[in-house]
């Protein structure tokens, strides 16, 4: 019984330890809870609007935010992982500046290429389709 009680008392310490070194980043486009320890987002919140434009992602690459410790493009030179958007640029393509902001490293998590270009892309496309169906 004492071990169970100790476990229950310590569980929140372990469960929320990752939040100690996390930063809440609010922008007009999305909100990110970013872990500087893991150098990736823990979660991202954004609104999915019906597509009203099609900004070109040509020439865009991920970039760092000076106020937060993140990985950078050099970390991915010889890496097998894709830099995957958490708030997808396809959902934020109504304006070039908005889409550019989706390329912050704080909005990126390393993903296996097959995941990023496979089921994750299908999920992003499906969410956009649902927004169009519901006219949101």
PLM regions with names:
Residues 3-14:
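Sec-dependent N-terminal signal peptides
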Residues 15-136:
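Domain-level detector for secreted/extracellular nuclease and nuclease-toxin modules, and
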Residues 1-2, 56:
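Short, intrinsically disordered low-complexity segments
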């Amino acid at each position: 019984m004492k071990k169970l009680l100790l476990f229950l008392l310590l569980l929140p310490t372990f469960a929320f330890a990752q939040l100690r070194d996390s930063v809440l980043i609010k922008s007009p486009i999305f909100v990110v809870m970013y872990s500087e320890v893991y150098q990736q987002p823990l979660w991202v919140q954004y609104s999915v609007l019906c597509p009203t434009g099609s900004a070109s992602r040509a020439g865009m690459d991920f970039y760092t935010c000076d106020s937060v410790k993140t990985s950078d493009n050099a970390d991915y030179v010889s890496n097998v992982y894709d830099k995957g958007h958490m708030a997808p640029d396809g959902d934020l393509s109504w304006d070039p500046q908005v889409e550019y902001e989706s390329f912050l490293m704080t909005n990126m998590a390393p993903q296996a290429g097959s995941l990023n270009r496979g089921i994750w892309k299908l999920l992003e496309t499906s969410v956009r389709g649902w927004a169009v169906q519901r006219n949101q």
